[in-house]
């Protein structure tokens, strides 16, 4: 579910998603109000990146863009916190979560950006209480609950049920109620850190979807993230399923 213009970038995005095997159910918007979003990313020699992002038409995502059949049939719904800035984006999230839950699915979010959390802290806190899982890094959790990390995760687990905290090269913490898994991370110097958070979420959610334990799901997220930071670009260049099997 998303929103792109019918310009060159929008058509390329929709076509590439379909080519990769993912249905992009919202066709490019003819004469859309803004151009398709884009991001210019500068990668320094230490692999860290600085992003200059224009959200464009994506920021206009609203409840009418949420497909009943898609959100209402999802076993796992994943929301992207970057689109939570505008009222219509918040309405879209709430509608998608409601449709997913009515059908018995699980809905969650990646907090995405501590500055976005700062801007909408109260709304995020309300949203988290309606979700089944939340993924964030240590800075985003601290921003959301305005306390130390341990206390923030305890509060988050009480609110959302399942919470994940990534810590940029340090152990990942996964907590559900009183159950906590600490997943070790092998520190490496990245070639390009772009996409690390997205790929962690992908690996982790694939683990949950296939019935893996919290620790195994966390490990799968780490394996996926490690692959994408080993080369330039935000998409994996290796068969991740094969990599999961290789890593045990």
For every predicted segment, state its role:
Residues 5, 11-30, 37, 41-182, ...:
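Ribokinase/PfkB-type carbohydrate-kinase core domain
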């Amino acid at each position: 579910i998303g929103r792109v213009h019918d310009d060159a970038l929008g058509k390329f995005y929709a076509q590439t998603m379909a080519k990769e095997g993912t249905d992009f159910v919202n066709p490019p918007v003819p004469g859309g109000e803004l151009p398709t979003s884009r991001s210019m990313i500068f990668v320094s020699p230490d692999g860290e990146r600085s992003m200059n992002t224009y959200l464009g038409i994506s920021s206009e995502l609203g409840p009418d863009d949420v497909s009943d059949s898609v959100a209402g049939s999802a076993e796992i719904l994943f929301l992207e916190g970057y689109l939570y800035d505008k009222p219509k984006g918040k309405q879209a999230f709430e509608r998608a979560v409601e449709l997913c839950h009515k059908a018995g699915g699980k809905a969650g979010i990646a907090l995405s950006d501590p500055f976005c959390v700062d801007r909408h802290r109260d709304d995020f806190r309300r949203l988290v209480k309606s979700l089944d899982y939340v993924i964030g890094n240590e800075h985003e959790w601290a921003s959301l609950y305005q306390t130390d990390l341990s206390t923030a995760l305890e509060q988050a687990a009480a609110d959302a049920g399942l919470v994940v905290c990534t810590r940029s090269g340090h152990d990942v913490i996964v907590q559900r109620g009183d159950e906590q898994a600490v997943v070790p991370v092998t520190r490496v110097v990245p070639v390009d850190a772009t996409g690390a958070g997205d790929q962690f979420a992908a690996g982790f959610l694939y683990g949950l979807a296939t019935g893996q334990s919290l620790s195994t799901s966390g490990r799968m997220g780490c394996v996926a993230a490690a692959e994408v930071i080993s080369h330039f670009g935000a998409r994996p260049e290796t068969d991740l399923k094969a990599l999961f099997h290789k890593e045990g």
